[in-house]
From Swiss-Prot:
Keywords: Aminoacyl-tRNA synthetase, ATP-binding, Coiled coil, Cytoplasm, Ligase, Nucleotide-binding, Protein biosynthesis. GO terms for biological process: valyl-tRNA aminoacylation. SUPFAM superfamilies: Anticodon-binding domain of a subclass of class I aminoacyl-tRNA synthetases (SSF47323), Nucleotidylyl transferase (SSF52374), tRNA-binding arm (SSF46589), ValRS/IleRS/LeuRS editing domain (SSF50677). ATP binds at K530. A motif ('KMSKS' region) lies at residues 527-531. This is Valine--tRNA ligase. GO terms for molecular function: aminoacyl-tRNA deacylase activity; ATP binding; valine-tRNA ligase activity. InterPro entries: aa-tRNA-synth_I_CS, aa-tRNA-synth_Ia, Anticodon_Ia_Val, M/V/L/I-tRNA-synth_anticd-bd, Rossmann-like_a/b/a_fold, tRNA-bd_arm, tRNAsynth_Ia_anticodon-bd, Val-tRNA_synth_C_sf. Its EC number is 6.1.1.9. Residues 721-747, 811-881 form a coiled coil. It catalyses: tRNA(Val) + L-valine + ATP = L-valyl-tRNA(Val) + AMP + diphosphate.
Amino acid sequence: MKEFDEMAKTYDPKEFEDRIYKWWEEEGFFTPKVDKNKKPYTIMMPPPNITGKLHLGHALDCALQDFMIRAKRMQGYEALWLPGQDHASIATEVRVEKEILKEGLNKKEMGREKFLERVWDWTKEYRERIKGQQKKLGVSADFTRESFTMDEKLNKAVRTVFVKLYEDGLIYQGNRITNWCPKCQTALSDAEIEYKEDQGFFWHIKYPVEGEDSFIEIATTRPETMLGDTAVAVNPKDERYKEFIGKLLVLPLLGRKIPVVADDYVDMEFGTGAVKITPAHDPNDYEVGKRHDLKEIVMLNNDGTIKEGFGKYSGMDRYEARKAIVSDLKEEGYLVKIKEHVHNVGTHDRCGNIIEPMVSKQWYVKMESLAKPAIEAVKAGKTKFVPERFDKIYFNWMENIQDWCISRQLWWGHRIPVWYCKDCGEIIVSEKEPKACSKCNSENLEQDKDVLDTWFSSALWPFSTLGWPDKNEDLEYFYPTDTLVTGYDIIFFWVARMVFSGIYNMGEVPFKHVYIHGLVRDAEGRKMSKSLGNGVDPLDVIDTFGADALRFMLITGNAPGNDIRYKTEKVEAARNFANKIWNASRFVLMNLDKEIMDKYKDLEEYSLADRWILSRCNSLVREVTDNIEKFELGIASQKVYDFMWNEFCDWYIELVKPVMYGEDEKAKGIAYNVLYKVLTVGLQLLHPVMPYITEEIYQHLGGEYKAIAISAWPTYEEKLKNETSENAMNQIIEAIKSIRNVRAEMNVPPSKKAKVMIFTEAENKAAFEMGEHYFEKLAYASSVSFLKSKDEAPENAVSSVTKGAELFMPLLDLIDVTKEIERLSKEKDKLKAEIQRVDKKLSNKGFVDKAPESVVEAERVKGEKYKKMLEAVEERIAALK
């Protein structure tokens, strides 16, 4: 009587991955309840942009979060992983504009309403596409609580926060310098700027001193911006320019009089040491302008053409104007020289256009008072970065924070909740659309045309997704969340903003830990990009190798904060591991007998191999649980891999095969139960990283839980700890490996059995005696005996030395003696090199004096061991000769 479902002969993830995911969802395993008797564990999924398909970075993000959430679910937490997507204001708008352009349409001709209809169509399609990709990866997220940053409930949260900030005096409208994209005609955040190396020029220009026959020479990479110059700055310590400070210069071509100001900002060694100051078109110049009360002259229109009031240059494109200005400077004798200069140019990451720093009227959030408690929270350990080094980046940004420009001149996004009375000019800030002006009662109101920066709504993600500002059970139970998993590239733009938004709106930090991961690079370490054509579609990988293999490769290759390299052979190796687990599980299930198992279920008359594997498995439970707590997910996965592949599959299963095929029913029953227990625990520990294969096998095992996904995480049992059995088995395994190696080197086939004679110290003998029967099966021994002295070994015996014993086998009738001497000579050379290394270390006074006593002693023990091994090898060579 077997009573176990037979598994398919071959591992084929396509046969069960989709089926299992559908079943998980139908059963509601990923939908936690509000249960005050259980602890919650919450992760908010960083919402991917709805601009296209997911890439390997998203796959890594999902795999790490899913590992954490699955482990916590099994550990008895009400584990919520809340998924969603980001509307990605400018990125989506640019993509949809490109789409309608293919139809011969443009945004302005369509009008706001029609264009937004198209964006919503796009949104619907891409949200479903993203969810489909995530489900393929096996994410155990609760899609019943799914959110989108443009949902009605999130829009309500956005408006509430905007009004609250405004009423608290933290939101204001003002003219400040910001990044401007002339193509998209909107302000941009620093996160949307991509810097590219450009071969440009330094134009050296004379600025004449008023009323004198002298000039100051400046150097600029943007000569067209001289139209907005309002000063030239020099360093007050620069002797070359001291006499000019306070004098007026005459701006070439325009004749505008501008002062020479002294400012420490100027680097005396760079360029000419004199800097033209254009406060309206350079962030550094803007600050200099504020310090010296300089006029801000905006010389560009929103589309990058020159404004009216600049003579013949007005109406020209900025680069057309550059050529004309340089030509005129040359003609009028102001151009001194042109030097080649390589510099970084800021471009809009969505449209590729070169951005212009420009003073414009925008809405801003005052950051100083919001940043302070957010800095203190991390310093106090309320939110911890993993790895810790990333808190320095966080502090650096927060301590030097500038006011945040939150308005964007776009159509797709959260419309700014501000209305202007067209009759009296009153500004009305309101959560709901006002019917009349609060000042003059006029109904002639117009809403601000701008939308909010995408990060404004993303900053509210940890609590807006739980229904805030409305009070409800979810918000009370699942907030604050536990862990945020994200890449190091958005610490400033997203993580920091969530921290201060959480403290400001909820009174506490939004998450306890921030797990930072690196980028997924190609095999050569290059960043994956369209231009390099080295991107990898996770769905293609899943189609070829299965989701479990991809997840395993991404997680085992990962350490917090570090980049990883994607290599196909690593995914292939992960698939081979899955295949190994599949075949081993199938073998176990084919041989288990439920009736015999039940009969001997509580019997603990374990063999040495049983005690060893139970002790090792028990240690693994404690180690892996500890690794997960420390966010060492890659280490945890590697440990499970090593145990399952080496100790369970390669050794334990082989060690118990004679029992399984034997006649002793009681021994069988005990072995069956150990096999079942260890396989189940191994699958449970592997489940967070390889959920599909572990679930499929678990269903065939017929475990006590409906699904492995909701099974109880294994616990450490002190009674199973058995160091004696572990030490004994380790010595036996090393000896068997050594015998196998010798036989392989000498080309002795398994069919040719040989006696094995063991010489060992008294303290090790018991271990070998306990496991001597294992040598017959796994070391192809015809018999095993123990020698009182090495002299008892037959002259024609080949030897092998391990840490615990010297093994002799009369193989000379079966081997080539010359080759054996050659092998031992190589072993002798290796041991001599090791002895030399240890002696060198122990003769180093610095090492002996500074290293801990235990480390020095360990080296001495090693040295003695190697010397004994060398002696034994030399004896065998002499005997053979």
